[in-house]
């Protein structure tokens, strides 16, 4: 079905491998001279501020990385649905979602190499400290990249070759099922803290549900070449999640250091520093964010392809692709604020000063901009659902509810954006009557009000999605119009 594209893909593969290899060589070549510099030597590049350069590269790396980690999560699930239902439409859809990774993966690696080069060149002392603290983790981190690349290319380029559904021998199937059951038992014991090393409860749940459980399911399902391909996809997601958790743990250590003394020297096992208080909350938040981001980008791709389609069959396919992508995005977007609350709670429990700086101090306006973007995402998502309803025959009976949902979202959005106070100068405070708080609106800036309205926005989005789902459902016939024949038949029975 896709074999005609293979030579082009193989050529692209060689180019991507060359890009990745070049990035790794550049990192190695420039890292050692950077580490050889004197302490606290921080420099600019091309006259640009070093912080802005690192921020830009990190942000671009996160954008593409979120897409690369998010798309395989739902692509494998769609492939499993197609495999179990024997419906080639789902298999084709999963392949098309996966094909979007071909360019994004190489770009992610390129920006990752540039980010590493910028960090080691512009902040050699800091990166030297991080490398000495997490030297064991960094080697595992690099090996995980090789494992992810290997799994991704086998998963993508082996799609056609691994379509055979001829069952393996009964003995081989029994071996795989035994491994799956044994791994599931280990998962249960690990989940309830019966086995395994000491760790926080959220980290234990994260690793049990996203590492051990998927692998046990993958082994148990393996019975033919197609299910083996699905297992490779599951492995790809597990390795990608491990890469994300490793990066998040090192980022969390920068904000909530653990396992070190006042001088910053490691006093305990590196696992204590790795499993800091913010490591898992960031991982959970990013996991949902990656899934929502991947779904929205894939939906945008489907929308563009829908516009450029030449016939009704293609339009129907890409309309369905956009529907599935939007379903994934909404499913991840709805619990995302709760993951953000969880992360914020852990930030305040670790350092109230850091939390106050984020929400009411130096970064208060940045936090307001973030709130604006979060509210905009929900508003745009609802608008996408409403516009999608216009293409569904029979959904016009639900149009009357849209204005009420829109009103609730707009009012909630306004409350969500209302700040409790603003960082003002002395002159501005005196012009406001000696107070930096609005006499009425200050109450809308408190978290109880914001918690209420964000929950209302989430419920409104969920209600819009329910209307979108029920758009093509037929009306239920009232009992008064059904006649008495069913009643008589039931009574006779």
State what each model feature region is.
Residues 32-493:
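Polytopic transmembrane helical bundles with strong interfacial aromatic enrichment
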């Amino acid at each position: 079905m896709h074999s005609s594209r293979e030579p082009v893909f193989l050529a692209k593969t060689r180019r991507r491998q060359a890009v990745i290899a070049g990035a790794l060589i550049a990192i190695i070549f420039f890292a050692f001279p950077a580490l050889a510099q004197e302490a606290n030597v921080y420099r600019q590049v091309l006259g640009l501020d070093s912080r802005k350069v690192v921020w830009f590269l990190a942000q671009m790396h996160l954008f593409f990385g979120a897409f690369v980690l998010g798309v395989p999560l739902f692509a494998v699930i769609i492939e499993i649905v197609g495999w179990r239902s024997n419906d080639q439409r789902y298999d084709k859809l999963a392949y098309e979602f996966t094909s979007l990774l071909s360019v994004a993966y190489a770009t992610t690696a390129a920006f990752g190499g540039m980010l590493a080069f910028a960090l080691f060149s512009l902040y050699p002392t800091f990166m030297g400290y991080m490398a000495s603290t997490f030297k064991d983790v960094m080697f595992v981190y690099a090996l995980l990249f090789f494992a992810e690349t290997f799994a991704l290319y086998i998963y993508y380029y082996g799609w056609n070759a691994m379509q055979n559904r001829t069952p393996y021998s009964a003995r081989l199937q029994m071996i795989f099922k035994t491994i799956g059951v044994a791994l599931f038992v280990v998962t249960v014991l690990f989940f309830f803290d019966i086995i395994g090393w000491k760790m926080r409860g959220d980290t234990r749940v994260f690793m049990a549900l996203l590492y051990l459980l998927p692998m046990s399911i993958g082994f148990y399902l393996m019975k033919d070449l197609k299910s083996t391909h699905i297992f490779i996809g599951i492995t790809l997601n597990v390795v990608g999640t491990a890469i994300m958790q490793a990066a998040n743990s090192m980022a969390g250590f920068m904000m909530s250091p653990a396992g070190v003394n006042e001088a910053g020297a490691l006093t305990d096992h590196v696992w204590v520093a790795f499993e800091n208080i913010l490591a898992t909350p960031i991982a959970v938040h990013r996991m949902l964010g990656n899934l929502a981001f991947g779904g929205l980008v894939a939906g945008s791709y489907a929308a563009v392809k829908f516009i450029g389609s030449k016939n009704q069959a293609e339009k129907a396919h890409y309309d369905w692709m956009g529907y599935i992508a939007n379903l994934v995005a909404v499913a991840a977007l709805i619990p995302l604020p709760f993951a953000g609350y969880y992360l914020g709670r852990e930030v305040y429990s670790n350092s109230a000063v850091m939390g106050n700086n984020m929400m009411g101090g130096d970064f208060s306006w940045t936090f307001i901009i973030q709130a604006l973007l979060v509210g905009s995402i929900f508003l745009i998502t609802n608008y996408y659902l409403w516009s999608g309803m216009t293409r569904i025959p029979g959904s016009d009976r639900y149009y009357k509810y849209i204005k009420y949902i829109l009103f609730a979202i707009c009012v909630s959005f306004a409350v969500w954006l209302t700040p409790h106070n603003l960082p003002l100068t002395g002159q501005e405070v005196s012009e406001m009557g000696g107070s930096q708080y609005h006499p009425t609106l200050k109450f809308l800036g408190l978290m109880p009000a914001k918690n209420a309205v964000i929950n209302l926005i989430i419920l409104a989005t969920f209600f819009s999605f329910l209307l979108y789902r029920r758009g093509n459902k037929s009306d239920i016939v009232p009992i008064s119009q059904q006649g008495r024949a069913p009643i008589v038949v039931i009574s006779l029975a």
